Amino acid sequence: MFIAATTVAAFTLGACGSDAASAEGSVMRIGVTQGVPTDLLTVVAENEGFFDKRGVNVELNPPALTNAVAAAVISNDLTVGSMVPAMLWPAIEKGACVKALGSLVGNTMDVIAQPGTEIAGDPADPDTTMASIKGKTIGVTARGAGMELWISQMAQEAGMDPAKDITFVGVGAPATAIAAFKAKQVDVLYYGPTMASQLSESEFVRVTDIIGKPGNALSGLNHGYPTASCSTIAERPNDVMNYCKAMWDTYDFSQDPQNAAVMGKWMAELTGVAPEAGTAAWEALKEAYLPMTITKESWEEQAPLAGSPAPTVPDFASSVYEPCAGGDPR
């Protein structure tokens, strides 16, 4: 399976790498994946001075691939990197000593279909609409990746069998995905607000409208945990806690309506869209961003969204860094 393969690679790489964990007060190398909104709060924390205010010396490092973050955190080439449960959990199971420091963002994805597709039901309730795409081809970033799991989960909750009733097609990142959709190479596509400037509402029909909304299969999704190795946490406790405090500061900043323009600016920078598109994307996504807290319940809730079949949930107490994720440490 794709997810398992990337995680095995990450764990294997953990045997080598630099000793980034060793020096308290030295540069913290933090992974930031460009082109997607996951690491927005990290970008804001650096560029709006929240890391500086907490005395954290940070260098943002964009990895080439999302799965490269897992390898880099485990090997200490990155001090902190955001990892989805589908990569974090298998790494822990295979013996990697890493801990989740907090939460970043929930679901940022909707599902759309070609113009003219008959969609029955309410897009805010996927249980009523997903059956309308039975028999369709669905474009996802890559086969076996998290996006396929999440759409499959919505299909299952709507009474479908994803293995039989829908066909997934890997179409890549937004630019190539949109091109494939416009060329009608797929019937259905993943969709997020950062894609709006390239694919307007008039060019599709909505299957779902659930970003930042409760009561659906993806309401509890955590799209990324900022994660550090156990050696980093043990050897740089002050740096790690100041990083955590800065991220809590940034979340508070993001939730103040007076800062919407700033959030839109950095959304545009991170995702590579025009400034006005960044502002619109922030407005659409702001409810999806999460405080750093991780609860045992929310941790266990990731299981059906982390693999198929659902993986074993790692022990919460030993896999989550409670001083940061247990509540506001400031």
Identify what each model region corresponds to:
Residues 176-267:
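Pocket-lining segment of extracytoplasmic ligand-binding domains
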Residues 1-8:
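Sec-dependent N-terminal signal peptides
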Residues 11-15:
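C-terminal motif of bacterial Sec signal peptides marking the signal peptidase cleavage site
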Residues 303-330:
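Conserved C-terminal helix/tail region of periplasmic/extracytoplasmic solute-binding proteins
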Residues 23-163, 168-171, 187-193, 209-210:
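Short, glycine-/small- and polar/acidic-enriched structural segments
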Residues 234-309:
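Secondary-structure end/capping motifs
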Residues 53, 120-124, 212-219, 286-296:
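Short, solvent-exposed loop/beta-turn-alpha elements that line the ligand-binding surface or hinge
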Residues 17-19:
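Bacterial signal peptide processing site
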